[in-house]
Each structure stands twice: as structure tokens, then as C-alpha cells.
Amino acid sequence: MSEGDSVGESVHGKPSVVYRFFTRLGQIYQSWLDKSTPYTAVRWVVTLGLSFVYMIRVYLLQGWYIVTYALGIYHLNLFIAFLSPKVDPSLMEDSDDGPSLPTKQNEEFRPFIRRLPEFKFWHAATKGILVAMVCTFFDAFNVPVFWPILVMYFIMLFCITMKRQIKHMIKYRYIPFTHGKRRYRGKEDAGKAFAS
């Protein structure tokens, strides 16, 4: 391999201007993502705003229904991954080779670890909306389709998928919306402390 053949390197072994530009752009993007991490409500309000703008655009243009359907299916897939545990309890239950000694109590606190964390869910959902928005600028994605059929398909798919997910939650007794172990507080001490 001769000098400058590797990706992003110029003839003199230094990174090329284009490579440095995109590296810097990626760093700025990651910095903004890192800064937005603690602001959960603000992030979701912005995403809902983008979603609203997208829906208004589709309504006014009277097209791109197949893109909207694909976006809905993508968001449903993300939501199911968000509600699902990282380790599927049905796989752990089926791995029994025979009788074994109990290793933990049923009531032991086990934190719910999601398959798709909230931040990644938000990030993927927002990127999906932006990609769908970009698709509405190209007529190639405006496939003529009878939109009530797509709405019916989506509602059926949503109901079937959520029914299966709720049955899974009930069967394996997990709730994806807990905020941690319950903390019990003692009685408030109303007496004054005495200094000796």
C-alpha cells in the first residue's frame, strides 16, 4: 500500500481536509447529543414538534402515505424494543436442564433493563422523522396508495403487537415503567437535638 492510500489520508500522511471536516462535524453533533442527554422532556417535546410538522406537511401535500406508514412501523418497532427487557425471561426459563436449587427469591428486586434505552429510542425516533421529512421532498417516494387501507393495517398491527407485549409482561411479571427500588421512609423526628 502506497503513501496516502488509506481512507481519509492525503499524500503526505495527514488527514485530508474532507476527512477532518466530517470528523469535526461528527464531534460537534456528538457534543450536542451529550449536552441534550439530561433534558428528557425538552428532547421529547422537540421530537413531538417535528412529528407534528411532518404530519401537517403530509396532510397539506396529500401524499407520501407509504413513507408515513413505514415511519409508523419503525416507531412501533422502536417502542416495542423500548418496552422489552434486555434479557428475555422466556429464554432464561426455557434453559432449564432439569431440577436445580433455587438461587434467588421471587420477590427479590431486579431492576428493569431495557433492550432499547430511552435516549437511543428518542434519537432513533427523531432521526426517523427527519428521514421521512426528507423523503417528502422527492416524488419518487410518493407511491399512490389508498391510505385508509394503510391506516387499517397499522391499527391491526399495533393492536396485535401490543396485545402480545402486554401478555408477555403479565406472564413474566415485569413493568417497564418502574423508577427503581421502592424506598421506605421512617417517621420524621420532631424532637430537637441536644448538644452535649
Swiss-Prot record:
InterPro entries from the UniProt entry: Rer1
Main location: Golgi
Pfam family, one: Rer1
A GO BP annotation: retrograde vesicle-mediated transport, Golgi to endoplasmic reticulum
Record keywords: Acetylation, Golgi apparatus, Membrane, Phosphoprotein, Transmembrane, Transmembrane helix
Entry GO CC: cell surface; endoplasmic reticulum; endoplasmic reticulum-Golgi intermediate compartment; Golgi apparatus; Golgi membrane; plasma membrane
Positions carrying N-acetylserine: S2
Transmembrane intervals: 41-61, 63-83, 140-160
Gene Ontology MF terms: acetylcholine receptor binding
UniProt membrane topology term: Multi-pass membrane protein
Subcellular location: Golgi apparatus membrane
Modification sites for Phosphoserine: S2, S6, S10, S95
Family: Belongs to the RER1 family.
General function of this protein: Involved in the retrieval of endoplasmic reticulum membrane proteins from the early Golgi compartment.
PANTHER family per record: PROTEIN RER1
Record protein name field: Protein RER1
